[in-house]
């Protein structure tokens, strides 16, 4: 259903532009510039023209993926220090970095010796460093303004996704590989392990005879470390927006790769078309258009491959109302979550959002789009239950998938082969 869309008056837009120019030009030294964009959510549904660059990147050339060579052209973004700080590591179960991996060959450490990227007996995981960044975000009419800076400019700049239960972290570690549950019941991010039917599945799918829903996935994450979190929430919102910033497009599959969004086969013996976690070369990003290959964004196959839906209990849909957890509080009742005031009643591709402080944007149903317009990703809704969010997409959903795709149609206990989970680790908190 299309609702009335509010467009700001010209005088308001001119005042906003004046404040944007003042902010981005005068406040910071050049070594820590503000990078910014405005997404014209309602007035332009073309994913390749609705993003306007502002600030230090006003005249930048965006990044672009060569789908044939699978190589990223960094455009004007190659020297961004935040992007350079995104490196692959092996870390202990509590988020301390043990050593750095060769960014172009994960089977090697940075010093050239063999790594533990495929060693399930290693006491830790293969993860990717996401350095803290500050974000300012607001709406003017249906234009969404987003600013990023590596230092806190003022109180409006928040470390969205880096606040863990009230403690701001210097970095977060995102999974390089889809979550798998090992023989000790621990959630892992290790190459050479299956995610489908170890970190997902109903009782008949799994040799243990145990259905793996949200509670079971959380238990596996917590068994590895009490610091462990689901890969979702505010940080994924921040990373999705950075993808838009880097590519100057809201069609992230077209910009970064289509992953494994169309590999499904109706055969449990073949893991329903999913694949075992595999080391993918090519550096920080790897993209393809065949819809049948592991891809990666920020060294993470989970972000780029769309093979299995990822449980994200930091967003719930309670009888049609979106509730969120900005600081990774885990509460499947939603009683302690923030009420966004946003209602969703039906499935759809949504072009507009509402900005939620400390969390990022959530979809609104004011304007419906498609797999080729707006944010290009689909949202499934059941407004009659308490639903737990899933993110990214699965290998049976094709162009419905993407970093803005969500399933808000299943309860926490819903266990299915395609509903998996991966772990997120915060940097150890300062004493």
How would you name each of these model-derived features?
Residues 1-26:
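Short, low-complexity N-terminal tether/leader segments at secretion or assembly junctions of large
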Residues 35-43, 237, 258-273, 279-281, ...:
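C-terminal, surface-exposed recognition/capping segments
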Residues 294-320:
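Extracytoplasmic, non-cytosolic globular domains
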Residues 114, 286, 407-408:
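Eukaryotic intrinsically disordered and solvent-exposed regulatory patches
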Residues 117, 121-124, 151-304:
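Short aromatic-cysteine micro-motif
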Residues 25-184, 224-230, 234:
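Extended N-terminal export/anchoring regions of large proteins
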Residues 318-329:
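A short, polar/charged loop-to-alpha-helix boundary motif
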Residues 136-138, 181-182, 238, 309-310, ...:
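Eukaryotic short linear interaction motifs
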């Amino acid at each position: 259903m299309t609702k009335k869309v509010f467009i700001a008056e010209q005088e308001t837009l001119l005042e906003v532009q004046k404040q944007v120019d003042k902010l981005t030009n005068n406040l910071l030294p050049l070594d820590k510039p503000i990078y910014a964009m405005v997404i014209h959510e309602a007035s332009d549904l073309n994913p390749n023209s609705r993003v306007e660059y502002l600030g230090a990147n006003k005249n930048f050339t965006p990044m672009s993926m060569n789908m044939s060579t699978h190589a990223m052209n960094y455009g004007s973004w190659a020297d961004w220090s935040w992007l350079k700080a995104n490196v692959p590591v092996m870390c202990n179960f509590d988020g301390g970095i043990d050593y750095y991996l060769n960014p172009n060959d994960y089977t090697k450490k940075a010093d050239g010796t063999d790594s533990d990227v495929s060693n399930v007996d290693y006491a830790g995981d293969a993860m990717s460093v996401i350095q803290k960044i500050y974000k300012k975000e607001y709406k003017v009419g249906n234009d969404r303004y987003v600013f990023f800076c590596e230092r806190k400019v003022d109180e409006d700049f928040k470390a969205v996704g880096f606040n863990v239960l009230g403690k701001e972290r210097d970095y977060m570690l995102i999974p390089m590989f889809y979550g798998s549950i090992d023989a000790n019941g621990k959630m892992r991010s290790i190459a050479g392990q299956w995610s489908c039917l170890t970190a997902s599945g109903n009782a008949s799918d799994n040799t243990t005879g145990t259905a793996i829903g949200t509670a079971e996935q959380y238990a596996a994450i917590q068994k590895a470390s009490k610091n462990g979190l689901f890969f979702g929430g505010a940080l994924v919102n921040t990373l999705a927006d950075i993808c838009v910033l880097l590519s100057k497009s809201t069609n992230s599959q077209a910009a970064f790769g289509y992953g494994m969004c169309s590999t499904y086969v109706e055969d449990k013996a073949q893991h329903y078309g999913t694949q075992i976690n595999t080391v993918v070369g090519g550096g920080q990003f790897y993209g393809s258009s065949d819809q049948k290959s592991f891809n990666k964004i920020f060294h993470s196959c989970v972000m780029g491959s769309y093979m299995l839906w990822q449980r994200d209990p930091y967003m719930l849909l309670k009888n049609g109302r979106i509730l969120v957890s900005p600081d990774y509080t885990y509460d499947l009742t939603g009683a302690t979550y923030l009420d966004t005031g946003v209602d969703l009643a039906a499935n759809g591709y949504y072009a507009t959002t509402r900005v939620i402080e400390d969390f990022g944007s959530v979809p609104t149903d004011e304007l419906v789009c498609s797999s080729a317009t707006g944010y290009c990703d689909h949202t499934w809704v059941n407004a009659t239950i308490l639903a737990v969010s899933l993110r990214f997409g699965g290998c049976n959903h094709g162009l419905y998938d993407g970093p803005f795709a969500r399933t808000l149609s299943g309860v926490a206990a819903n266990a299915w082969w395609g509903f998996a989970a991966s772990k997120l680790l915060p940097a150890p908190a300062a004493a």
